[in-house]
Amino acid sequence: MRVNLNMPTDTTLLLIDDNGDRRSMFKQFLRESGYNIAASVTNPAKLVDATRQHKPDAIVISTDKPSRRLLTEIAELQEAERRPIILFSEDDNPETMQQAVAAGVNAYIVLGLSSNRVRTAVDLAFMNFRQTETLRLKVIEVETALRDRKVIERAKGIIMQQRGIDEAAAYALLRDRAMRRALRIAEVARMINDTNDMLTGVS
């Protein structure tokens, strides 16, 4: 099945492969599919450095078997320079595939090359990456909202105790102060909490 996400023709890829003949074949397939090759790297250990240098839209890795070092590089990359990653390998061991996906690979393809297959793999990786990013950002948004809520609740309690007002009035005071300072309510609440901790000796 061909998955076509109508990727722009200026999409750039970083190619990682220590096999010269296979690397040349990948270059040909990727260019036939309309992708630009930002760079091709022979040493998988240079993955993070090469990504920071060339800033590709996605990364294509081809290897006989993904090494522990390569998987570590992928995990480090996805912490600092998140990109869709497509890994082609001759290793069809399910455990290896699971380790690769856990490290941050978006599409793991057992080698068997053709131009259409390479293009489909890249398209699928972009789709998987976007879905994963959407979920990751939603999780971060929820976690941030929960942290902010706890901060605001504590600040309201401090204001209520110090000023002898009810919860609604305390929140209104927080909101008004945030508006005057062009800050988020949680930021003002955090300032109040920090000041209270300093004055009461809480570390």
Label each PLM-derived region with a short phrase.
Residues 34-43:
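Short hydrophobic/Thr-rich beta-strand motif most characteristic of the beta2 strand and flanking loop
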Residues 140-203:
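C-terminal output/effector regions of signal-responsive regulators
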Residues 95, 113-122:
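C-terminal output helix
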Residues 7-21, 26-30, 59:
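Conserved acidic segment of CheY-like receiver
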